[in-house]
UniProtKB/Swiss-Prot annotation:
The modification Blocked amino end (Ala) is found at A34. It is found in: Plastid, Chloroplast; Plastid. Fe cation 1 binds at E138, E176, H179, E262. This is Stearoyl-[acyl-carrier-protein] 9-desaturase, chloroplastic. GO terms for molecular function: metal ion binding; stearoyl-[ACP] desaturase activity. It comes from the Eukaryota. Keywords: Chloroplast, Fatty acid biosynthesis, Fatty acid metabolism, Iron, Lipid biosynthesis, Lipid metabolism, Metal-binding, Oxidoreductase, Plastid, Transit peptide. Fe cation 2 binds at E176, E229, E262, H265. Its cofactor is Fe(2+). Gene3D superfamilies: Ribonucleotide Reductase, subunit A (1.10.620.20). PROSITE patterns: FATTY_ACID_DESATUR_2 (PS00574). It comes from Carthamus tinctorius (Safflower). Pfam families: FA_desaturase_2.
Amino acid sequence: MALRITPVTLQSERYRSFSFPKKANLRSPKFAMASTLGSSTPKVDNAKKPFQPPREVHVQVTHSMPPQKIEIFKSIEGWAEQNILVHLKPVEKCWQAQDFLPDPASEGFDEQVKELRARAKEIPDDYFVVLVGDMITEEALPTYQTMLNTLDGVRDETGASLTPWAVWTRAWTAEENRHGDLLHTYLYLSGRVDMRQIQKTIQYLIGSGMDPRTENSPYLGFIYTSFQERATFVSHGNTARHAKDHGDVKLAQICGTIASDEKRHETAYTKIVEKLFEIDPDGTVLAFADMMRKKISMPAHLMYDGRDDNLFEHFSAVAQRLGVYTAKDYADILEFLVGRWKVADLTGLSGEGRKAQDYVCGLPPRIRRLEERAQGRAKEGPVVPFSWIFDRQVKL
């Protein structure tokens, strides 16, 4: 989400400085989500390409984890099977999109669709912008499975590997796939949005990929997914609350059900990182600090509809204004993870580890202070057209 923020730079000893730009990009979940922190890689390639938008350019680092640490992940496969796979649900016990939608085989289908559309008419355009942005991000699921399979030591080496890491990745993907299916079909039936523009945006986004800067490291990767799943839980929970406020209890149920899945997935990913802190506290706190210095970028930050080069920033600004995902949420999530992993209580760290510990523990209040200053200076945002809603204009 976007805030108008005066540039401020804070220095942390031996750590890269971070700065808040005039208009920060607070990536919205799995949006994935980013912080109010500005990008440390300002270069932009503006050359138009047939299947991807202009994008930030930075040096891509690969395979940064020392090879010997791969053994850590092999050594805890038994633990993962017992403690991580339990957070998956058997398919026969999972909800499916059809459970929440008009039944096309029913004689009452037409009437059910009319009722859905009548409820949707009462919901404002800005809410639909956020709901569409969330759905598009969910629909880029092929990218997220690909990202998990870049991680050394835990990737699915065959496409049908029986290691618990590979089983988790495939089953997690299968569970997540229902989210996009459900939201996509709801939006199609609502009649409120331009489905062709939305579908183009999805194709552009999948074609563009993502680079969360996890460097093939499962340390960085699982810290990233821990943050993202909690951010998604927050975002879908807030869209549920707004839907209820607008009188659409069934849409609120849809968003709340998706949020519940995200919470369960968050639990699994945070348990993995908790285990890494137990086995390798120094390496894990260094990875945590590294990920936070680079900022948590949203998987959908390359969102593009063929028209608006700043589509993600515009979508994020609307979500920020509505309170669906905000700078405060970013700080709250970071503070939650610091507490969940008991980072402040770590002992026996190296000198670099202690500095990383101080950095991540001190970051949430620093973000909040800067956000409060930014809110004090915030100006009323402009209105921009969104192709997703037939170019109707929405205030940022």
